[in-house]
């Protein structure tokens, strides 16, 4: 079975990561590679690490260039994906790495993104309860945000097992600068980032907040309220999320650990580390893996979970390819046997 795939937004970090993974996928043939302002350029000028694809010329991101493929990956700014996706054939598997189709609540979309809601697609985080079934045979898939991927992996087992209170969830995430994209910004230049960390989107203002609340609320079966603070870290890629929540009365440390073990022991990409071993971002760099650890703080009655992912791989492109595999009935791990990089 050979699948023809087109990738849009190929000049950016997310699009480049999709291509890196697809280049090693045993069942994929890469067709159109498109961009907008960089159309006409050699891919190797913009993504010099993609040696096997370096001579490919970027085409313009149009419906005509993307049509005729089995699968289309859209790695575009929010708003752009919905416009193109609406014009692609229903039989084409369209995988949106942008935000356009993640949120279920139109009011939340309009509040945080300021435009009309384009609708909701199956959510491409297979490790969440029920999501594998939702993705099987899907022709439209919304790739989760990178912060929500780490946050939902961190806390979903506790809410799904009815062990956590819904009203006092605090999540702090540190991300590498690639999460902000390739566009030149003063706060992302080396002199500003090296040796420094800084928060942003503080006070509930980050666009991933409603997405995190949505996922945790679905797992809990009731409204979950989240305080989310993202932080820019002096590294190119990776996310370290520390998430805490109050545990329900009578919940023990053993029950907490068992809930996370039950959720992830059979997962190929999510790893609950042995007790006492805490994860670092370097261990998952360049891979589709997530590593986590948890502890119960009896002084505050809270569970503390730390989860690390690569924001570009498990947090975007790897999760997208994993979801594609499920949708098409391929082995879920196809093309994703990537280990972390050390040192």
From Swiss-Prot:
EC annotation from Swiss-Prot or TrEMBL: 1.2.1.38
Keywords for the protein's UniProt record, in alphabetical order: Amino-acid biosynthesis, Arginine biosynthesis, Cytoplasm, NADP, Oxidoreductase
Principal subcellular localisation of the protein: cytoplasm
Domain of life where this protein originates: Bacteria
Coiled-coil ranges (or none): none
Reactions this protein catalyses: N-acetyl-L-glutamate 5-semialdehyde + phosphate + NADP(+) = N-acetyl-L-glutamyl 5-phosphate + NADPH + H(+)
Active site residues per record: 146
GO annotation terms (biological process): L-arginine biosynthetic process
Keyword Oxidoreductase: yes
Subcellular localization(s) per the UniProt record: Cytoplasm
Broad enzyme group: oxidoreductase
Entry GO CC: cytoplasm
UniProt family annotation: Belongs to the NAGSA dehydrogenase family. Type 1 subfamily.
Protein name from the UniProt record: N-acetyl-gamma-glutamyl-phosphate reductase
Organism of origin: Pseudarthrobacter chlorophenolicus (strain ATCC 700700 / DSM 12829 / CIP 107037 / JCM 12360 / KCTC 9906 / NCIMB 13794 / A6)
Gene this protein is translated from: argC
């Amino acid at each position: 079975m050979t699948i023809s795939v087109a990738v849009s937004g190929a000049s950016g970090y997310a699009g480049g990561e999709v291509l890196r993974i697809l280049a090693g996928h045993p069942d994929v043939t890469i067709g159109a590679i498109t961009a907008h302002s960089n159309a006409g350029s050699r891919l190797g000028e913009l993504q010099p690490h993609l040696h096997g694809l370096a001579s490919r010329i970027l085409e313009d991101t149009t419906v005509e260039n993307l049509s005729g493929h089995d699968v289309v990956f859209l790695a575009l700014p929010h708003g752009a994906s919905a416009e193109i996706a609406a014009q692609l054939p229903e039989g084409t598997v369209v995988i949106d790495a942008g935000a356009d189709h993640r949120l279920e609540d139109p009011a939340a979309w309009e509040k945080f993104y300021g435009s009309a809601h384009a609708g909701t697609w199956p959510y491409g985080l297979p490790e969440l309860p029920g999501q594998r079934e939702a993705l099987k045979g899907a022709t439209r898939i919304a790739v989760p945000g990178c912060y929500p991927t780490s946050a939902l992996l961190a806390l979903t087992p506790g809410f799904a097992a009815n062990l956590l209170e819904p009203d006092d969830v605090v999540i702090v995430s540190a991300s590498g600068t690639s999460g902000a994209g390739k566009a030149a910004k003063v706060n992302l230049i080396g002199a500003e980032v090296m040796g420094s960390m800084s928060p942003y989107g503080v006070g509930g203002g980050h666009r991933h907040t409603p997405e995190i609340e949505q996922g945790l609320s679905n797992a809990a079966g009731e409204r979950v309220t989240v305080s989310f603070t993202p932080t820019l870290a002096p590294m190119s890629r990776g996310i370290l999320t520390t998430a805490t929540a109050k545990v329900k009365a009578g919940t023990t440390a053993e029950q907490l650990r068992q809930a996370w073990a039950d959720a992830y022991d059979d997962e190929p990409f999510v790893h609950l580390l042995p007790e006492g071993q805490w994860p670092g971002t370097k261990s998952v760099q360049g891979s589709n893996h997530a590593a986590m650890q948890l502890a119960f703080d009896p002084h505050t009655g809270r569970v503390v979970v730390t989860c690390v992912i690569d924001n570009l791989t498990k947090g975007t492109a790897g999760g997208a390819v994993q979801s594609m595999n499920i949708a098409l009935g391929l082995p879920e791990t196809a093309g994703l046997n990537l280990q972390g990089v050390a040192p």
